[in-house]
Amino acid sequence: MARFFRRRKFCRFKADGVKEIDYKDIATLKNYITETGKIVPSRITGTSAKYQRQLARAIKRARYLSLLPYTDSHQ
C-alpha cells in the first residue's frame, strides 16, 4: 500500500538568511496573504514565530501605505 508523503515545512526567511522583512518588498509579501487579503498563518506556511511577527508587521505597514489592499476587489 502506497503511503502519502507530506513535504516538511520550513521557514524560507531563515533558510535564505534574511535579517529583517521589508514592507516595501511587495512581491514577497503577496505570497503570505490570501486572495481575500488575510495574513496566512505560520502553521500553513511554515514560517518561524520570529519571522511571522515581522511578516505581519510588514504587511500591516504596507496596507497602511496603500501598497497592499486590506481586502479583495469585490468584483
UniProtKB/Swiss-Prot annotation:
What GO molecular function terms would the record report?
small ribosomal subunit rRNA binding; structural constituent of ribosome
Keywords (A to Z) from UniProt: Ribonucleoprotein, Ribosomal protein, RNA-binding, rRNA-binding
Q: Which domain of life is it from?
A: Bacteria
Instruction: Write out the transmembrane intervals.
Output: none
Any single Pfam family the record assigns to this protein: Ribosomal_S18
Q: Which GO terms describe its cellular component?
A: cytosolic small ribosomal subunit
Ribosomal protein recorded as keyword: yes
Extract the InterPro entries matched here: Ribosomal_bS18, Ribosomal_bS18_CS, Ribosomal_bS18_sf
SUPFAM superfamilies per the record?
A: Ribosomal protein S18
Q: Which GO terms describe its biological process?
A: translation
Could you give the subunit structure recorded for this chain? Part of the 30S ribosomal subunit. Forms a tight heterodimer with protein bS6.
Task of the protein: Binds as a heterodimer with protein bS6 to the central domain of the 16S rRNA, where it helps stabilize the platform of the 30S subunit.
NCBIfam families found in the cross-reference section: S18
Give the similarity note.
Belongs to the bacterial ribosomal protein bS18 family.
Its recorded name reads Small ribosomal subunit protein bS18
Q: Name the gene.
A: rpsR
